[in-house]
Amino acid sequence: MQETPKANRLHIAIFGRRNAGKSSLINAISGQDIALVSNVAGTTTDPVYKTMELLPLGPIVLIDTAGLDDVGEIGELRIKKTKEVMDKTDLAILLFSAESTDYSLEKEWLAELTERKIPVIGVINKIDEAGSSFQSVDLEELFDVPFVKVSAKERLNIGRLKEAIQTHSPLDFERETIVGDLVKPKDIVILVAPQDIQAPKGRLILPQVQILRDLLDNDTLALTVKDTELEDMLSSLVRKPDLVITDSQVFHKVNAILPADVPLTSFSILMARYKGDLEMLVKGAKVINSLKPGDKVLIAEACTHHALQGDIGREKLPMWLNQKAGGALDIKIVAGVDFPEDLTGYKLVLHCGACMFNRKQLITRLIRAAEQNIPITNYGTAIAELNGILDRVTEKLL
């Protein structure tokens, strides 16, 4: 892996009307002609993502969206997709054209961004084309956000916009470390990574790579082994490991092998702590014990993938949950952005580790569940509860 994963980058979305210059602004910030620019209104349809480095801030994702004023049946669908972008937005740029005098839509969208607690920078574009009557101070008085005046086409004041992005970016868009606060230099940490058919050929899955890198950055003695070789690894060590991190699917096997005084957790639980609210997810996992046949359960995955035999979300978890409930549950499985607005009626929501989501996107889903009083947990905490070891695998983390 040579690049920072998209999920770990600050997500900056640009919202504005058609032909306000959103795509031109993307090109100006990135210094490349990567977004299609046209005088025809509605050139951008689906959201467009561009990863880049914005120094000194670091790796970011710029998101170009469809116009706020898109019309017709297709336009409504485009606006719906644009609103879905807000679920993953860490910082919003609300774009105004210096040629415009109607700001009613911008007020509506600012209200929604504010309600979602997304920091906003107002950008007035096309200042090179503005008439002598244009007064930016009037616009700035209407909107209580910081403003920058630019010409995306002529690349005017783009440096000032980058400075504003640096200044107003949220400091807490992600935790500084996944596991570094749990270990110290020279600690022995064993990663148990069973290589099944779901793993990409010749590669580890993303959470394993990220956690291994974090352990190396924190000067630990990181050892990676398959579950079938764990006992051999333990017997070869001169002292007990300080921490064992395993794939949740082999919790039962690893728990049986490890001495009780060796701390144990999983990749999924660490990612839940890194991106979400682990205490909420642990509380949600306890609900598994009260599920009854016929109860509605939602299983949500962050990414869409071709499910193979033994898929954790589509086969194993439903089977284990049905066994625990003593009969068939009413289980619905969704993937990608297909997460219901209305969760009422569900007894429990189970979410994957969300390695392909940024923190904002996962937190948005947790908040949605909390606002509707629906318990939510993730795969790792759920599997730990099903195996009766949830307290053990979270005791160092809460």
Question: Where are the regions a protein language model picked out?
Answer:
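Canonical P-loop GTPase G-domain recognition
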Residues: 118-121, 126-181, 190, 219-222, ...
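Conserved hydrophobic helix-helix packing surfaces used for dimerization/oligomerization
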Residues: 12, 189, 295-297
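Conserved G1/Walker A P-loop phosphate-binding module
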Residues: 1-76, 80, 84-87
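Long, well-ordered amphipathic alpha-helical subdomains in the mid-to-C-terminal portions
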Residues: 182-208
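G-domain G4 guanine-recognition motif of GTPases
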Residues: 65, 96-99, 118-134, 148-156, ...
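Conserved C-terminal guanine-recognition region of P-loop GTPase G domains, centered on the G4
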Residues: 50-58, 77-147, 177-181, 204-220, ...
